[in-house]
Design a protein with these regions (language model features):
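Extracytosolic (periplasmic/ER-lumenal) interhelical loops and adjacent juxtamembrane/interface segments
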Residues: 92-113
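Ser/Thr-centric signal marking residues that sit
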Residues: 29, 128, 199
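Short loop/turn and capping residues at structural boundaries
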Residues: 52, 112-116, 147, 201
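Long extracytoplasmic/lumenal interhelical loops at the membrane interface
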Residues: 106-142, 169
């Protein structure tokens, strides 16, 4: 079982990475990097009282971060999540176009490279951040289900390899990769359907 100093050092290292990335500024990616760095710490046996302490500390600093550290466009991303129709041609444009693309795909989609939202450049970063919207529009629900099945198979294989590993290091490393991969999938999907603010992943 790791010592308390090991958890502290790892947390500091993850926070330094978060700070450097967030200064770009890229707060979303910085948070993802921090969480990804903390996943192995949790899997190594981080006590629940420490996790609770992290959460309490996060709740305490959130008002200060919102008022003093977040840039205006970052605050607007959060506010847009609550009411994307308030500025449909400005801050709400990305999520509105994304939801339109997803909803218009239907069961089978409009066909490969035949999506109007994606091919006419209504969707920003359609090749990366909003690729889920493009797949939903062009391949429909069937394409999305096929994608989830493929993702599920990859994640299942990762955790199966972790289960078969002989050392704790191998198990923690493999399981961490599986959880980080799952984290990126969830963030991307939840972002494009409007459940969490838009971040680049």
């Amino acid at each position: 079982r790791p010592r308390m100093s090991d958890w502290f050092i790892t947390t500091i290292a993850a926070f330094i990475c978060f700070y450097l990335v967030s200064r770009q500024p890229d707060l979303g990616t910085g948070l993802i990097v921090f969480v990804s760095g903390m996943i192995p710490v949790y899997l190594a046996g981080l006590p629940y009282r420490i996790i609770l302490g992290y959460l309490v500390g996060l709740a305490m600093v959130t008002p200060y971060v919102w008022s003093n550290l977040l840039l205006e466009y970052q605050r607007q991303r959060v506010l847009t999540l609550l009411n994307p129709e308030a500025d449909p041609l400005g801050t709400g444009w990305n999520i509105n176009q994304s939801q339109t693309a997803i909803g218009s795909g239907g069961l089978t989609g409009k066909g490969y490279l035949s999506g109007t939202q994606s091919q006419l450049d209504f969707i920003p970063e359609s090749h990366s951040d909003f690729i889920f919207s493009v797949i939903a529009e062009e391949l429909g629900l069937i394409g999305i289900l096929a994608m989830f099945i493929l993702y599920g198979f990859i994640i299942w294989r990762i955790f199966r390899i972790s289960y078969q590993s002989e050392t704790n290091f191998e198990r923690i490393t493999c399981s961490s990769l599986g959880f980080i991969f799952l984290l990126f999938i969830l963030i991307n999907v939840l972002m494009v359907i409007g459940i969490i603010p838009v971040v680049g992943v």
